[in-house]
Amino acid sequence: MYEANMLRLSQRISNAVNHFSTAMMSGASASLTEGSAIIPFSNPNEVFYNPVQQFNRDLSVTAIRAWSETRSKKIVAKSHHRHQLLDQNSELSQENLTKCDTTHDFEKNCSEKTDSTSADNIAGFTILEALSATGLRSIRYAKELPNVKRILANDLLENAVKTIEKNVNYNNVSDIVIPNKGDANAVMHMNKFHYDVIDLDPYGSAAPFLDAAVQSVSKDGLLCITCTDSAVLAGNAYPEKCFSNYGGSSLRSNFCHEQAVRHLLYAIAASAAKYGRAIKPLLSLSIDFYFRVFVQIKAKPVLVKNLQSQSLLIYHCSGCGSFAEQPLGKTSPGRLPGTTKFSNASGPPVSANCEHCGYVHHVGGPLWGGPLHDAEFLKKMRAIAEDLDPEVYGTKRRILGMLALADEELPDVPFYFVLSQICSVLRSQSPPQNIFVSALLNAGYRVSGSHAKSNAIKTNAPWSFVWDVLRSWIKDHPVKLENISKTSAGAAILEKTPTAEVDFTFRPDSEFASKKEGYTRYQMNPTENWGPKSKPGKRTIAEVDSKS
C-alpha cells in the first residue's frame, strides 16, 4: 500500500511538472491550476512556480483554517461574556441569562444577539504575504479560507506586483487581495501588531525578516515561515553562517533536519523575546528540501522568562554519534504559591570524552528545546484535513500522513537517531525496527518515530541502554571483528559487556500508528533535479525595472 501510494503521488507531481513545462515551452497563452486558484501566463518569465511546493500551500491552508477556527471560538466566547455582563447590568430576565449561559448555547440559541454574519465579522482576520511573487498563495487563501477580511500580497519587484494584480483580477478576489509594491521589512515595520497572519516564504533564509515579523503580527497571531537554506541550517559546512543567521551553530549529525527546525524556532523566539513576546510552536516540520513552521505569537512578557529553560546546547559525539542535551536554564516552584523561580542550569551533561567510545564531543546550539508541535492544534488540523476535497487538495494523503507522524512524536524528547547509522558504528546488521523498538518498550521506555526521517527513532532511553540492546543483539548475530578497527568507536563500545537485561519479545505497539493507517508518510523524489527552483526571469525582470 505504501509503495502504491508513493507511486501515485510521484506520478501526479511528475505529471504536473511535465504539464507546466510543456505549457511554458509552447509559447502560447496557458494557465496552471492549483487548489482553487488559476494562474494565467504567456511568458515563462512571468511566473515563478514550483509544483512540488503544492504540499506547502495545501498544508498552509489547513493550518490557517485550524488556527482561525480556534481563534473564532475564543472571540465568540469573549463576545458572549460581554453580552452576559451587559445583560446583567441591564437587568434582563433570568430566562434570557439562562438561555445564553454557555458559549455553546450562545452559538445555538442566541441568534437574536449575534447571528452568523456578525460572528464572522467579529472573527475575521487579515493576512500579509510579504514575498508574494505571483500571488498564487494569497489567491488560494482568499478563495479557500473563510472569514478572511483582507490579504496584502506584497513584492519588491514592479513586474511581480503587476503579475499579482493580473492574477487577482483573473480570479475575482480583488475585494480581498490587495497587491502592494514594497520592501517586506518596511511593510511590516509600518504596521506593528497589525496582521493576524504573516506568511514568509522566501527564496533562501527567512532570518532577515524575523525581527519585523514578530513585531508586525497581532496578539495571538500566526507566523507561517519557510526556510530553504538547508545547507546552512542542516549541514556542518557553514556553522558560522548558521550562528550569524539563527543564533546557534549547526552540527553534522543524523538528526540534522530536526536540528534545523529547532534553529529556526530559536531564532524566532529570540527575536520575539526582545519585544516582550513569546512563541508557541503549533506545527514545525522538515519537509523535502525546506523547513516550514507555524508559530503563534503570545504577547505575554511573563512567558518570555521561559525562553532560557526552553533553550539548549547539544553535545554530539564525533565517534559513535550519541548525544546529550544541556538546557541553559531551569525552573522550580517559587516561595509563594503559584510562582516560578528561574535560575541557571547545572552542567555539563557529559565529560570531555564520550563515556561510550572515548571520542570527543562537538557542541551545537543554542536551539529551541521545547515542543515542536501543539497536540490540540494537530488534532484540529487532522480533523480538517480528513474533510479536504482531494481534487482540490492533491496532497491530502500526504498532509494526513505528515500530521499523523507529527502527532505521534514524543513531545519532550529532542532529537532522534537512525538505527542503521548506529549499527554501522558497530559494523553490525540492523535488527528489524519493530524488534529494536520492542526491546526499548519492554524495558519501560517510551519510543516514537520522527516526521523528519523515515527510519528515525526517538526515545527517552539513555544511550547506555541503547548500546546494551545492540550488544545483546550482536551476541546472536555476531559481527566480523576483523572489519572493526581497534581504535574505532565501535571497538570501544563492543569491548564492554551489557549491564542491562534486554527482552526482544515482540510487542504489537512497536508498529507506529501512522504506518498502520496507510497514509503517505515520506515523500520520494518524484522528478529529476527535485528541489527549490531557480528564480526564472530574475535578470529580465530586473532589467525591465531598471528601464522603467
Swiss-Prot record:
Alphabetical list of Pfam families matching this protein: TRM
Binding-site list for Zn(2+): C317, C320, C354, C357
Annotated EC: 2.1.1.216
Sequence positions that bind S-adenosyl-L-methionine: R57, R137, D155, A186
Catalytic activity as recorded in UniProt: guanosine(26) in tRNA + 2 S-adenosyl-L-methionine = N(2)-dimethylguanosine(26) in tRNA + 2 S-adenosyl-L-homocysteine + 2 H(+)
GO biological process terms, semicolon-separated: tRNA N2-guanine methylation; tRNA processing
Zinc keyword on record: yes
Keyword Nucleotide-binding: no
Domain Trm1 methyltransferase: 30-470
UniProt KW keywords: Cytoplasm, Metal-binding, Methyltransferase, Mitochondrion, Nucleus, RNA-binding, S-adenosyl-L-methionine, Transferase, Transit peptide, tRNA processing, tRNA-binding, Zinc
MF GO annotations: RNA folding chaperone; tRNA (guanine(26)-N2)-dimethyltransferase activity; tRNA binding
Coiled coil regions in record: none
GO cellular component, one term: mitochondrion
Region (Disordered): 523-548
Family the entry assigns: Belongs to the class I-like SAM-binding methyltransferase superfamily. Trm1 family.
Function as written in the Swiss-Prot or TrEMBL entry: Dimethylates a single guanine residue at position 26 of nuclear- and mitochondrial-encoded tRNAs using S-adenosyl-L-methionine as donor of the methyl groups. Also has tRNA strand annealing and dissociation activity independently of its tRNA guanine-dimethyltransferase activity.
NCBIfam families: TRM1 (TIGR00308)
Protein name: tRNA (guanine(26)-N(2))-dimethyltransferase
Organism annotation: Schizosaccharomyces pombe (strain 972 / ATCC 24843)
Lineage: Eukaryota, Fungi, Dikarya, Ascomycota, Taphrinomycotina
